[in-house]
Amino acid sequence: MPIKPLVILPDPILREISKPVEHIDSTIQQLADDMLETMYNAGGIGLAAIQVGIPLRMLVVDVSIFTSIFEPDAPQDPIIVINPEILWLSDERNICMEGCLSIPGYSAEVERPKRLCIRYRNREGEQKEIEADNILATCLQHEIDHLNGCLFIDHLSKVKRNMVIRKFEKRAKENNLEKEIL
């Protein structure tokens, strides 16, 4: 399974809205496997297809490193999520420290709904629903945001968000990458 290169801020593809997966076939299944391998290699707990440059409504998560200790009733296997639809979000809120493989080296506290329910297709194309809370709910919301062109820094104050964007634009310029205003 090849490890895919990660798309890093300020790459404008991160702001694209991903398109639905039309057919779940061996190509999509291989992409899911590659995304998991890429996520594990980078030390992440979630990855959206857009973060490897593929604008499809698809993501992978594996929060077992946390849940095995703190939430043993939560899913302990990786979850492949295709064409997710949020069915509901709780009114109760939770603040979690979030980071992102596309914004390396930066993390911040983000407030989100504590629980949610999503409907999605799995790797085999079967329709599933999952109710999640705590770290899994946060991770799913974070990755679904990516599918809609939203980054976790968009949940921060304008001052903090602009500071992060400027830092990564400067880094991109120093690395002779194309500068793009988000």
Swiss-Prot record:
Its EC number is 3.5.1.88. It comes from the Bacteria. Its cofactor is Fe(2+). Binds 1 Fe(2+) ion. GO terms for molecular function: metal ion binding; peptide deformylase activity. GO terms for biological process: co-translational protein modification; translation. It catalyses: N-terminal N-formyl-L-methionyl-[peptide] + H2O = N-terminal L-methionyl-[peptide] + formate. Belongs to the polypeptide deformylase family. This is Peptide deformylase. It comes from Bartonella bacilliformis (strain ATCC 35685 / KC583 / Herrer 020/F12,63). The gene is def.
